């Protein structure tokens, strides 16, 4: 079995593959203070709950935007899976030509998403990932990573309002039924969520003007479905895009 890790600033998402089939996926909190043994015990419990054995994992791939966690998980997989993981980074085969000024600056998660989106949907394609940050990536019809945009995510926006104002409360990110709201909490929710929808649609329209009017737009990440319900530019949501990208990259490097 192949175990894939997508390590983000807020969550770690894991997928277990048998061949090309995703058997299970899990989401746990990203905690820098956890040791490799603590992660090993937690992941082992998730496996056992789903009738699986961690020792049956014979391959691992890790994509991480949090370097300390990457090293912790690397130690964990060596000890508990008896296998050295493939790390998404410089030198691995992705099949994508990165046109960034400095290709090493591109986050591993963005590369993984680009690989999956091009493999599944073809190009040109735009990938929007709604995570801690909201990122946009442009991939050409020739499988070139042209660049993109990094914007504050919804949770960051909500936290900023709470932390930088004297009277505004901490809120849950749920979508109000109307844009015009009659209380503070729903007014904040409206501004953050519908404001994000407006940002997404404007940025996508500008991206299409600059590189491909016919680009297909795929969204992923925790808030993707909520934003896609209101967006006029998102064509589809793929919750497992990053996990699929990790599987594809592993297969390209397995030989």
From Swiss-Prot:
Keywords, sorted A to Z: ATP-binding, Coenzyme A biosynthesis, Cytoplasm, Kinase, Metal-binding, Nucleotide-binding, Potassium, Transferase
Active site as annotated: 109
Compartments in which it is found: Cytoplasm
Subunit composition and interactions: Homodimer.
Classification via PANTHER family: TYPE III PANTOTHENATE KINASE
This protein's GO CC annotations: cytoplasm
Cystine bridges: none
Name of this chain's protein: Type III pantothenate kinase
Function: Catalyzes the phosphorylation of pantothenate (Pan), the first step in CoA biosynthesis.
Cofactor comment: A monovalent cation. Ammonium or potassium.
NCBIfam families found in the cross-reference section: baf (TIGR00671), PRK13318.1-5 (NF009847), PRK13318.1-6 (NF009848), PRK13321.1 (NF009855)
GO molecular function, one term: metal ion binding
Originating species: Thermoanaerobacter pseudethanolicus (strain ATCC 33223 / 39E)
GO biological process: coenzyme A biosynthetic process
EC number in record: 2.7.1.33
UniProt cofactor(s): NH4(+); K(+)
InterPro entries reported for this sequence: ATPase_NBD (IPR043129), Type_III_PanK (IPR004619)
Residues where ATP binds: 6-13, 132
SUPFAM superfamilies: Actin-like ATPase domain
């Amino acid at each position: 079995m192949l175990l894939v890790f997508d390590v983000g600033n807020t969550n770690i998402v894991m997928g277990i593959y048998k061949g090309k089939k995703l058997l299970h996926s899990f989401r746990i909190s990203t905690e820098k203070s956890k040791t490799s043994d603590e992660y090993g015990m937690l992941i082992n419990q998730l496996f056992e709950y789903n009738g699986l054995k961690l020792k049956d994992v014979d391959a691992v791939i890790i994509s991480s935007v949090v370097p300390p966690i990457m090293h912790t998980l690397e130690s964990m997989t060596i000890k508990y899976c008896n296998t050295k993981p493939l790390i998404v980074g410089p030198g691995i085969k992705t099949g994508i030509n990165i046109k960034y000024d400095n290709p090493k600056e591109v986050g591993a998660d963005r590369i993984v998403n680009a690989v999956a989106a091009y493999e599944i949907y073809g190009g040109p394609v735009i990938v929007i990932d709604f995570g801690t940050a909201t990122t946009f990536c442009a991939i050409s019809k020739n499988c070139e990573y042209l660049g993109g945009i990094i914007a504050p995510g919804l949770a960051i926006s909500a936290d900023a309002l709470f932390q930088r104002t004297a009277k505004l409360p901490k809120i849950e990110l749920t979508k109000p039924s109307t844009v015009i709201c009659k209380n503070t909490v729903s007014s904040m929710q409206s501004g953050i969520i519908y404001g994000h929808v407006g940002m997404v649609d404007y940025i996508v329209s500008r991206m299409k003007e600059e590189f491909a009017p016919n680009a297909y737009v795929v969204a992923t990440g925790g808030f993707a479905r909520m934003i896609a319900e209101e967006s006029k530019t998102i064509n589809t949501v793929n919750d497992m895009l990053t996990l699929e990208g990790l599987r594809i990259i592993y297969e390209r490097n397995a030989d």
